[in-house]
Amino acid sequence: MISRRHFLQASIASSFIFNSLGINNSSKVMAQQNISEKNLLDFKSFGNVSIMHITDIHGQLKPLYFREPDINLGVGNVLGKPPHITGKEFLKYFNIPVKSADAYSLSSEGFSSLAKTYGKMGGLDRIATVVKSIRSERPNALLLDGGDTWQGSYTALKTNGMDMVKAFNLLEVNAMTSHWEFTLGIERVMELVDNHLNFPFLGANIFDTEWDERAFEPYTFTEQNGKKIAIIGQAFPYMPIANPSWMFPGLSFGIREKNIQEIVNEVKSKNADLVVLLSHNGFDVDRQLATRTEGIDIIFCGHTHDALPIPIIENKTLLVASGSNGKFLSRIDLNVDKGIKDFKYRLIPIFSDVISSDKEMANLINEERKPFLSILKEEIGETDSVLYRRGNFNGTWDDLICNAIIDERGADIALSPGFRWGPSLIPGSKITIEDIYNATAMSYPKVYLTEMTGNTLKIILEDVADNLFNPDPYYQQGGDMVRVGGMGYKIDINKSQGNRISEMTMLKTGDRIEPEKKYKVGGWASVNENTEGPPVWELVEKYIRRKKIIQIEKNNSVKVITG
């Protein structure tokens, strides 16, 4: 494990903003604490290469609230290592004062109250301001997109990703990789890549199954201050497992460790001074990959939505985690001379009330949203609870979705996927149609209703649990744990596959779920092609309209054994 001293030495020039921050209830708290655009962007240029990174935007054009996880368990070699520490432990580990701006942006501690103080984060118009500011002093600074960009909002759904393509073209991104992009269907992906995207769509690990040839560009070269930079793209390796393979027939993915090493060797043979892996593997996969390959200087991580204030170092490789939903933009300046000699890093928090809106990007966003604005802004209810998704187990957004499935479809048990995307709502917020789509907008949304035996339910839970808690990161193949409604269970994350789940119980009666008994189960986002049922957003809208006020009780239905 890297020591805290090693962390601090590795990013000696890394710039946090919390040093002068306290907290009070004043509406002028930002000004009082000297949190200004100038303060947030203050960064003395360093070295000869500058790179910016954003990832997992999930279609979010506008500022939002996003609560970080309060539980993000690690197993095996990553137990107790970042990013598998949360809340107070996270703040203590990185020496971040409680109630500070950094505590709000990077942890779940006091989220609801701090959100009222520090406000929303993100917004591509604010990100555009940051990008332009950095490029004003470093004109050739690279901007890399880690993927999960074209999906996750109403406008992305209705435009089939075109709104995000336009926005990222305007940002002048230099390269991207992918995951959820392929749920638009391979034909749409190719249409956007071939006819609309102004920068490389990289996927060194995506192969044509018929010819066993690469289906996309594996890497691209660029130059900055005389230094040749190789950017290798690594798409999400488990697409056919986690998402519907019928949407992208003829393609295979995978980690392809040997393939990556061969490409690294290839770009080095072509005189690359710096080798960058733009990855959507997930942080733990990237950490292991760094220990099993040689010659990768930086991995820009994606998929798991982790936000870390400083890079992690594994086997001389820097791992950068830039969060999700537009909350952060990473900037790293490097002194490059046949590899990294030194670096300076900052995870820039995009506080929407502080960073000014870029007019050009704001105009584009307004134009993309204009045809749908009356729908997006329609208020259908209000929440008394914080609605969030991110975390290993049930979040309140998914509790709401499960409740809607049970009530509207007459199910005994509801299953909701362990997706990490979707903004949060703070207590007292109106719930709009846009909010529902932000938590559900995807291309296979149908809510099925079927019968499953207790045995089948256990197999499903065991399978997902192994995808999350297998001690070998290369077998961690999905999102967070499937969310459940109407039932509870106990999970021992350290046991082997098939032995983690026990004490499955019907919450309404307290009865144990019987292996051979059939139960009426509703769920959504099935990867099966012929799934029948209404779209999930339709059920959730009906449920909220009927309830009017949403109040989610604390969910204690999942008992987690970690020791």
Please state what every model-predicted region is.
Residues 344-346, 381, 449-451:
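Short amphipathic
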Residues 8-12, 18, 30-352, 360-361, ...:
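Acidic, metal/ion-coordinating pockets
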Residues 345-356, 506-510, 526:
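Short, solvent-exposed aromatic-acidic interface loops
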Residues 359-431:
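Hard-cation-handling environments
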Residues 19-26:
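C-terminal segment of classical bacterial N-terminal signal peptides
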Residues 316, 384-389, 442-444:
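Flexible glycine/proline-enriched surface loops and loop-helix/loop-strand junctions
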Residues 1-2:
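Secretory targeting signals
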Residues 35-50, 54-76, 198-204, 217, ...:
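Feature captures C-terminal
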